[in-house]
């Protein structure tokens, strides 16, 4: 029979199965038809009527029929079927620069976030750092797209979740649908702070937006601030960041940075891609920008000091060869967050095999 399989991105595809096929066999079927790179068997979660299906059960046992559908999503667990440092990635003939969002005008070279200090070993990095980075750099949806996503997740749950529950999970996941579904099944961790923001963006006039996703959950950059707001500021009192004080997205950024200062680097890096004019303005007014970040805000203790010494904590740049860039991409393809891959690669003296071994041995530490 033909079976429809839906994804969290709203797309769907069909596979041919037998009612007696096990869920593991269906996962293998999906891996074969959609490619191992996109849907590795070991990372798949198949959902039917709000229930995660067990590998050893069959379609008929789970009452899956041709008239129904399955939902497929990828878990963050690292398995042998989805990990391998020898996996190939498209090569690049251009020289790449790995940058940690320096407060300078962005260039056309590729840039990513690297923590400011290389003296800290990889194993000392807290798990919350990668979790917060994932929240900030993941695909975001907003406005009417959120309403559509809420409906899709409710449909996926087969009536198991109401709108309020789904909305709360999305807020906790910073509008990342895959993470939100994880929260719905496993519960929202106590360490996760649910931002008090209006998901629909109604009345704010300024929404978190992102271009259509082109890959994994970390493929779409953030658009923290609208271009027109920066243009208005530049056209008026050039050299001031006062307009950020009333910006909803900036307030959310302050809250996140207060919880974990490391998140500022990747968020500024993404900002440089989406809004280079604002990044240039921040570059010209670094002291004022840090002062705005350090100002007490509602919900804080009133004594926030994100950077004790701004000059000492500002990000830096690290150059890599095309071969090293390919190594980083292969490590990232194993399923690890890009920031963690960079940390491991540099700490292992740019040795891909050592970095891969470290990432696999400590994979449990990187999971949410």
From Swiss-Prot:
Transmembrane segments: none annotated. GO terms for cellular component: cytoplasm; nucleus. Residues 116-136 have a biased composition (Polar residues). It comes from the Eukaryota. Residues 142-185, 320-360 form the UBA domain. Widely expressed in the whole plant. SMART domains: STI1 (SM00727), UBA (SM00165), UBQ (SM00213). Residues 80-136, 202-222 are annotated as: Disordered. One of its GO terms (biological process) is response to UV. It is found in: Nucleus; Cytoplasm. GO terms for molecular function: damaged DNA binding; polyubiquitin modification-dependent protein binding; proteasome binding; ubiquitin binding. Disruption phenotype: Increased UV sensitivity in roots, specifically in dark conditions. The keyword Lyase does not apply. Residues 80-111 have a biased composition (Low complexity). Keywords: Cytoplasm, DNA damage, DNA repair, Nucleus, Repeat. Its main location: nucleus. Disulfide bonds: none annotated. Residues 1-77 form the Ubiquitin-like domain. The keyword DNA damage applies. Residues 239-282 form the STI1 domain. Belongs to the RAD23 family. Interacts with 'Lys-48'-linked polyubiquitin chains. Interacts with RPN10. May be involved in nucleotide excision repair. Binds and presumably selects ubiquitin-conjugates for destruction. Prefers multiubiquitin chains rather than single ubiquitins, with a binding affinity for 'Lys-48'-linked ubiquitin chains. Acts as a ubiquitin receptor that associates with the 26S proteasomal docking subunit RPN10 for the indirect recognition of ubiquitinated substrates of ubiquitin/26S proteasome-mediated proteolysis (UPP). Involved in UV tolerance in roots, specifically in dark conditions. This is Probable ubiquitin receptor RAD23a.
């Amino acid at each position: 029979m033909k079976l429809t399989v839906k994804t969290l991105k709203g797309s769907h595809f069909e596979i041919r199965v037998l009612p007696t096929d096990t869920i593991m066999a269906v996962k293998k079927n999906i891996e074969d038809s959609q490619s191992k790179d996109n849907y590795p068997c070991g990372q798949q979660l198949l959902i039917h009527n709000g229930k995660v299906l067990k590998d050893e059960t069959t379609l008929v046992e789970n009452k899956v029929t041709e008239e129904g559908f399955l939902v497929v999503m990828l878990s963050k667990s690292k398995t042998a079927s989805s990990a391998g440092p020898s996996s190939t990635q498209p090569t690049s003939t251009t020289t790449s620069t790995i940058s940690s969002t320096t407060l300078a005008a962005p260039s056309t070279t590729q840039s990513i976030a690297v923590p400011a200090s290389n003296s800290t070993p990889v194993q000392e990095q807290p798990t919350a750092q990668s979790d917060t980075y994932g929240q900030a750099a993941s695909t975001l949806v907003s406005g009417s797209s959120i309403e559509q996503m809420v409906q899709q997740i409710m449909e996926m749950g087969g009536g198991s979740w109401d709108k309020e529950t789904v909305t709360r999970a999305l807020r906790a996941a910073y509008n990342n649908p895959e993470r939100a579904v994880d929260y719905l099944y496993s519960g929202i961790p106590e360490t996760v702070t649910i931002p008090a923001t209006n998901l629909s963006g109604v009345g704010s006039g300024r929404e978190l937006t992102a271009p259509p996703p082109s890959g994994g959950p970390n493929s779409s950059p953030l658009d923290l601030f609208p271009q027109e707001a920066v243009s208005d500021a530049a056209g008026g009192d050039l050299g001031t960041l006062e307009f950020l004080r009333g910006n909803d997205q900036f307030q959310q950024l302050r809250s996140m940075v207060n919880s974990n200062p490391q998140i500022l680097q990747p968020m500024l890096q993404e900002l440089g891609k989406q809004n280079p004019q604002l990044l240039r303005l921040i570059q010209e007014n670094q002291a004022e920008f840090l002062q705005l970040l350090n100002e007490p805000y509602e919900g804080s203790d009133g004594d926030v000091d994100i950077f004790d010494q701004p000059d000492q904590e500002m990000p830096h740049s690290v150059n890599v060869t095309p071969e090293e860039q390919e190594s980083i991409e292969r490590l990232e393809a194993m399923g690890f967050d890009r920031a963690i891959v960079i940390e491991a690669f540099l700490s292992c003296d740019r040795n891909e095999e050592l970095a891969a071994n470290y990432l696999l041995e400590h994979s449990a530490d990187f999971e949410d």
